[in-house]
């Protein structure tokens, strides 16, 4: 009788525990099923031990405990399948979380690139607007191409394309001699027999003084006085600084006659 009463109490307890186990999570339900299996197994073993010692037949109670044990084992197997499925789902969730993190990193990288592109586009738009303003301003104060070409020709006619190292903007000197200045320079006078000396030689009085005539003197401030000696023709040496050969009274008279003729011709032309 004691065994039957304890079996009934155990059935009631198992029923209450089974009802409560259905309300928890899968982990709690598995733990509850394991506890039930442990209790039922212990109860069945105790009943078998008592029946063997007392040699009493308690088949009905043993069958009930065994049925409960089999039922709880079936529940446990179902819970195990559910736990395995949930484990697979959990692994899939972890894989999806990693994929989400990767996509999130890609989105952040794209966002950074989009911000850089936005900044570049904003700069380009600003520059385009400024250029449009400049174009509009140029259209309002437009100058014909013919006037620009004329102005360029006027600049090129009076100035060279490059300048000496000492030349700076605003310098009153011209960068390089013009065509007119070249013709009135040393080379131009040497090629012009009417203004040069006899047989293309320099006047004797100028050479005797060790200087060039005023007509052939350097026309530019950056040319030194030493250039007057270096620019002498090749057939003249430094002996001219002392006294050129053939320098006599007759030569001086010839020079005076030539200068008188040139002055008279210039006065007649006036």
UniProtKB/Swiss-Prot annotation:
One Gene Ontology cellular component annotation held by this UniProt entry: nucleoplasm
GO terms assigned for molecular function: nuclear thyroid hormone receptor binding; transcription coactivator activity
Residues in coiled coil: 26-131
Residue ranges, annotated region (Disordered): 1-21, 227-270
Low complexity composition-biased segments: 259-270
GO BP annotation list: positive regulation of transcription elongation by RNA polymerase II; positive regulation of transcription initiation by RNA polymerase II; RNA polymerase II preinitiation complex assembly
Family: Belongs to the Mediator complex subunit 4 family.
Subunit structure: Component of the Mediator complex, which is composed of MED1, MED4, MED6, MED7, MED8, MED9, MED10, MED11, MED12, MED13, MED13L, MED14, MED15, MED16, MED17, MED18, MED19, MED20, MED21, MED22, MED23, MED24, MED25, MED26, MED27, MED29, MED30, MED31, CCNC, CDK8 and CDC2L6/CDK11. The MED12, MED13, CCNC and CDK8 subunits form a distinct module termed the CDK8 module. Mediator containing the CDK8 module is less active than Mediator lacking this module in supporting transcriptional activation.
Listed name of the protein: Mediator of RNA polymerase II transcription subunit 4
């Amino acid at each position: 009788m004691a065994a039957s009463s304890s079996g009934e109490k155990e059935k009631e307890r198992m029923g209450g525990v089974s009802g409560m186990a259905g309300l928890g999570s899968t982990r709690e339900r598995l733990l509850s099923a394991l506890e039930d299996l442990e209790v039922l197994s212990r109860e069945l073993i105790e009943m078998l031990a008592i029946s063997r010692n007392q040699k009493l037949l308690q088949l009905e109670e043993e069958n009930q405990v065994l049925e409960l044990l089999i039922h709880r084992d079936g529940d446990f197997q179902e819970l195990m399948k559910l736990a395995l499925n949930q484990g697979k789902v959990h692994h899939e969730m972890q894989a999806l979380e990693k994929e989400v993190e990767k996509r999130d990193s890609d989105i952040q990288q794209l966002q950074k690139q989009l911000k850089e592109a936005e900044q570049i586009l904003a700069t380009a738009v600003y520059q385009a607007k400024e250029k449009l303003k400049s174009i509009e301003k140029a259209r309002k104060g437009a100058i014909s191409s013919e006037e620009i070409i004329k102005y360029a020709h006027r600049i090129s006619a009076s100035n060279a394309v490059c300048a000496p190292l000492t030349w700076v903007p605003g310098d009153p000197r011209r960068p390089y001699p013009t065509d007119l200045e070249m013709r009135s320079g040393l080379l131009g006078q040497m090629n012009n027999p009417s203004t040069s000396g006899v047989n293309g030689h320099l006047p004797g009085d100028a050479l005797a003084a060790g200087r060039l005539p005023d007509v052939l003197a350097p026309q530019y401030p950056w040319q030194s006085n030493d250039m007057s000696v270096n620019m002498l023709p090749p057939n003249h040496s430094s002996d001219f600084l002392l006294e050129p050969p053939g320098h006599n009274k007759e030569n001086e008279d010839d020079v005076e006659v030539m200068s008188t003729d040139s002055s008279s011709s210039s006065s007649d032309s006036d």
